[in-house]
């Protein structure tokens, strides 16, 4: 799912890119990324072996998540043998899992739903919850149909299950629970500071929208400023429609086209304040933690999971929030030495994610798809075809098998690919062919 016109600045793209770059180093993966051809994109540090497939997507996020172009996916499934769809649009999980025309469930493409967000009752009822009821239903059924659901936080998982219990029967909820896993994630490592502002500086890198409760945050800032305290607030992620409301004497509004420039600005600040009532992770807070900034946040949603245990600067009320901020400024507390911040790094996340994928395919390692072919004459033909070649074009091999009297129901691309692997052929992204090791 893409949120902004500049793909390179999209938070979902950044997470996927960083994970791809890490996982490729293991030598175990080939990645294809589906991106919107109608949005802006420039070549960045995405690993050169990652193959980009361009396709048209709706502009609106709400339209993207209910959009499933069967013609495009049919062509993708015809051309490539895919083991796993790392699905960032969880509403489509059941379609992607069962779209393939095959009779055998264990030969379908596996689907790993990657939950970035949840439609939950903690969102504004009239603007973001009630109008998205159809998306909520799709999220739940998409989660039910996937092989595995990955959640960055326990709170994110809890929200989905809470909604599912209102819609599904208990045994169906149990199916989602049994195919779900929670592991804290992250997409960067420690952020070092070359320079810090001399004036006590808060970064506000959250949206000025709805559930972020940004008005509450700036009401507290106003109280501090009117009490004579000296500080400034850098806004980096403001929604244009509300920027006029925060055009205050202590505020500086900055925008960045490059993510690296934004990170550099963040590294100059001391504290991150948020009043959000709905989160599934909160990348902006994780970034500040990895720069050892002080976090002042509600003692709820995902924040207790992101900070250390017994972290001292989570609040229960606006009055408590004011006292915490006042204490930070008066005592010039400009950093916090987190003991558990490694749990939020891309290094840790990539290790966890690698294990999750490996475990998902563990059973396949002990199964031979070639040996399960019933007709000996077919096995002989396939074996001869593969033993006389060092390079295989997947489409040619598929056509060869189909000429033996088979079709996609009994020989889907995923099965054909596994047979190639059993005969020590590996996929080479640059040539789009399989070569013998």
Regions found by a protein language model. Give the residues of each.
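Conserved donor-binding/catalytic core segment of Leloir-type glycosyltransferases
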Residues: 150, 187-212, 218-225
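Active-site proximal beta-strand in glycosyltransferases
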Residues: 84-86, 100-124, 128-135, 143, ...
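A charged, aromatic-enriched C-terminal amphipathic alpha-helix characteristic of glycosyltransferases
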Residues: 333-374, 408
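Aromatic "clamp/platform" in nucleotide-sugar-dependent glycosyltransferases that forms part
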Residues: 277
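A short, active-site helix/loop in glycosyltransferases that binds the activated sugar's phosphate group
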Residues: 136-179
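Short hydrophobic beta-strand element within catalytic cores of glycosyltransferases
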Residues: 294-297
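Nucleotide-activated donor-binding/catalytic signature segment of Leloir-type glycosyltransferases, i.e.
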Residues: 242-263
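Short N-terminal targeting/anchoring amphipathic segment
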Residues: 74-94, 112, 150
């Amino acid at each position: 799912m893409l949120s902004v016109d500049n793909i390179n600045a999209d938070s979902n793209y950044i997470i996927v890119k960083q994970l791809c770059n890490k996982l490729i180093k293991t030598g175990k993966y080939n990645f294809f990324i589906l991106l919107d051809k109608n949005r802006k994109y420039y070549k960045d540090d995405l690993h050169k072996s990652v193959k980009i497939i361009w396709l048209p997507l709706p502009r609106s996020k709400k339209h993207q998540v209910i959009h499933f172009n069967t013609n495009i996916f049919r062509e993708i499934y015809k051309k490539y043998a895919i083991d796993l769809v790392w699905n960032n649009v969880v509403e489509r999980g059941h379609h992607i899992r069962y779209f393939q025309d095959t009779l055998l469930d264990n030969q379908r493409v596996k689907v790993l739903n990657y939950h970035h967000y949840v439609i939950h009752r903690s969102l504004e009822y009239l603007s973001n919850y009630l109008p998205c009821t159809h998306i909520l239903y799709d999220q739940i059924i998409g989660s039910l149909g996937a092989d595995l659901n990955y959640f960055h936080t326990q709170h994110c998982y809890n929200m989905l299950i809470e909604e599912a219990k209102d819609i599904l029967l208990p045994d169906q909820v149990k199916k989602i629970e049994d195919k779900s896993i929670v592991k804290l994630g992250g997409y960067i490592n420690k952020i070092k500071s070359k320079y810090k502002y001399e004036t006590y500086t808060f970064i506000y890198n959250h949206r000025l929208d709805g559930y972020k409760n940004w008005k509450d945050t700036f009401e507290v800032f106003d109280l501090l400023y009117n009490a004579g305290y000296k500080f400034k607030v850098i806004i980096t992620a403001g929604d244009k429609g509300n920027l006029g409301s925060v055009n205050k004497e202590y505020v500086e509004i900055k925008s960045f086209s490059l993510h690296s420039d934004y990170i550099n600005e963040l590294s100059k600040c001391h504290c991150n304040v948020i009043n959000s009532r709905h989160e599934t992770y909160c990348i902006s807070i994780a970034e500040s933690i990895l720069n050892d900034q002080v976090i002042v946040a509600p003692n709820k949603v995902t924040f207790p999971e992101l900070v250390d245990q017994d972290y001292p600067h989570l609040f229960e009320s606006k009055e408590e929030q004011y006292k915490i901020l006042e204490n930070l400024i008066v005592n010039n507390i400009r950093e916090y030495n987190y003991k558990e911040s490694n749990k939020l790094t891309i290094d840790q996340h990539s290790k966890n994610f690698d294990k999750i994928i490996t475990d998902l395919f563990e059973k396949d390692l002990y199964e031979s798809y070639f040996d399960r072919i019933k007709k000996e004459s077919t096995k002989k033909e396939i074996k001869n075809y593969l033993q006389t070649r060092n390079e295989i074009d997947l489409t040619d091999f598929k056509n060869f098998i189909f000429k033996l009297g088979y079709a996609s129901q009994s020989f889907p691309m995923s099965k054909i690919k596994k047979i190639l692997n059993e005969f020590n052929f590996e996929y080479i992204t640059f040539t789009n062919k399989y070569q013998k090791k």
